[in-house]
Design a protein with these regions (language model features):
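Positions that flank functional sites
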Residues: 33-34, 160, 209-210
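Residue-level recognition of oxygen-bearing side chains
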Residues: 69, 186, 199
Length: 216
């Protein structure tokens, strides 16, 4: 069984959702909303010195951090789930491109947003502008990604991949779905489709309940 260090509404939800689709046993061993402060981060530092989520501990006890790395590793361990283009497949390069883009360009903004003092120190007067600029940056990145894709049923074609799950979870965070739908109309129907997957209905309700305010 896989063990996860995670939190409801966090990046671990993408990992958990993929494991649900794969029908692979797992448990959230430690629930730690790290954005709530040092006490929560202290629950994670024994396995990740960066004190960040998610963390996956394999059945052999190996620790894997970084959401994209975990998702890619899981697709290699469970190829029968068919949640990633195979090496040599026509969509493989774009799959790897966007799986890397999300943590590099988008996910990283939330380290700043969760606690603006990490960048601005005690100068609280600049917090609102910092939050606005990071939200604008996230929206711009979604727009860039949308402009480079031609989704079908899913982002890369007719077959769902972990990329679809990754985008569905990350697009629920600030600046939220309303703006996401505005700047990324091509991806909008895909994330709505993943929101509505029957296989994940109970899971979403438990780990990242749908908020009607997301819809524009």
């Amino acid at each position: 069984m896989y063990n996860i260090y995670g939190a409801a509404g966090s990046g671990s939800v993408a990992i958990e959702a993929v494991l649900e689709l794969m029908e692979v046993p797992y448990q959230v061993l430690v629930e730690a909303p790290t954005w709530e402060g040092e006490a929560e981060r202290a629950k994670v530092t024994p396995v990740n010195p960066m004190a960040q989520l998610p963390v996956l501990v394999t059945t052999q006890g190996e620790v894997i951090t970084e959401s994209a790395a975990i998702l890619l590793w899981l697709t290699e361990q469970h190829p029968e789930a068919n949640l990633a283009p195979k090496p040599g497949c026509a969509t493989r390069a774009q799959f790897l491109r966007w799986m890397s883009f999300i943590p590099a360009a988008i996910y990283s903004m939330y380290w700043v947003r969760d606690e603006p003092e990490r960048i601005a120190g005690d100068n609280k007067a600049v917090y609102p502008e910092l939050l606005q600029r990071t939200a604008d940056r996230v929206a711009h990145c979604w727009h860039v990604m949308d402009s480079q894709l031609t989704p079908q049923l899913f982002l890369l074609g007719q077959q769902m991949s972990v990329l679809d799950i990754y985008v569905t979870v990350a697009s629920r965070w600030t600046p939220g779905r309303r703006r996401f739908y505005q700047v990324a109309p091509g991806m909008a129907e895909v994330v709505r489709r993943v929101d509505g997957l029957v296989q994940l209905k109970d899971f979403w309700a438990r780990r990242f309940p749908f908020n009607t305010d997301w819809d524009g």
